[in-house]
Swiss-Prot record:
This is FBD-associated F-box protein At5g56370. Residues 332-382 form the FBD domain. Gene3D superfamilies: 1.20.1280.50, Ribonuclease Inhibitor. Coiled coil: none annotated. Residues 1-52 form the F-box domain. The lineage of its organism: Eukaryota, Viridiplantae, Streptophyta, Embryophyta, Tracheophyta. It comes from the Eukaryota. Pfam families: F-box, FBD, LRR_At5g56370.
Amino acid sequence: MDSISLLPDDFLLRILSLLPTKDVLNTSVLSKRWRYLWKLVPKLQYSLIDKNADHGTFVRFVDRSLLLSMAPVLESLHLKLGRQCSEVDIGFWVRIAVEKGLCELDFDYEHYKTEPCRLPQSLFTCGTLTVLKLKNVSLKDVQFPVCFKLLKTLHLEYVIFLDKETPQKLLSSCPILEVFDLTRDDDDVDNVMSFSVMVPSLQRFIYCGGSGAELVMNTPSLKYLKLSGCGYECMIGNLPEIVEAHVEVACSTDDILTSLASVKRLLLCLPTEPELPTGTIFHQLEHLEFCSCCTEWDILMFMLKHSPKLRSLKLNETHGYTIVSQSDPMFHWEEPSSVPETLMFVLETLEWRNYRGLKMENELASFLLKHSRRLKIATFSPADCKQVRIELRTTVGMKYRILMELARLPRGSAECELVFG
């Protein structure tokens, strides 16, 4: 302990900031110097989700440690609470943190079939916040306008709004917002049928939506986009700055793909028979990951045909086959009448994960290897033999057969190295 005590305060505070506040306070018994050091820790973490925990003791502990905090700036407050904590206590803690110049709030309210938590109005006029993360919170009673002049990161998970206008009022109060992560429930549980994201400064947007909703986007500075979920409609404006996108949706896709014409890295997992855009060319696309779980291979051929700079292609059964029958479109593939020029002149890397060696897969693998004249490396990783569904299991014997079949396939590139992962 003597050697640790010789370390400078700044270094010790960085270490203590990584610990839950309860553990930080326990260090005060180590020495006289440590007795007051915990009061300067700029990051505080509190958690009470155990139903059997002593609620009164926890409340007194949080009250005391927050009130005694002497950090010049309260960098972050992380609250993970259950419904045994009242809104009165929670509001008191948040108000104290705001008064201490709070920079980051991560509020996770664990509830089950109960009303989401309401937070004090003072939070929504906190001029020092740069990061705000809310889970299971109600914004019905928030009085607008609000002010988040320094907020750059906003996470909303299962948040309830007053009406469809509330989200845009909130976002318009964040003039320099760069990161927005939004998770919604099904239907109109959050009281917003059409969610509008109109943020000129936004650079990163992650959206997970349920069914029966609509997403409208106008984010011209966006560089990263991730869309997941099913049953919602998307209307997306032009994204001239987009660099990377993950699209895993079961909804109308032509508008989405059209807006991603400038993307450089793209992951696609689309429904069967998707709507494909007419005339869209992915001039900047260099890396494509294509999910093979439940989509038709015509989509892949479409992407190869319209991506003249594609250097890397990855195929991956991310979610597992949802249908196993001879009528499943995944079990049928017809060779196109013409070979995409991307295969002949550009593609350098091919990776296929969870390869099962199905007749259709073998035909597609043969087509890709045969016509990829610039291919440098092709990696095939057989599917896991521990699949719960018997019909999808790949035994050791099957893996050996698969690898032998792949090794015998002709390759259009003399430099192509075949790797079995």
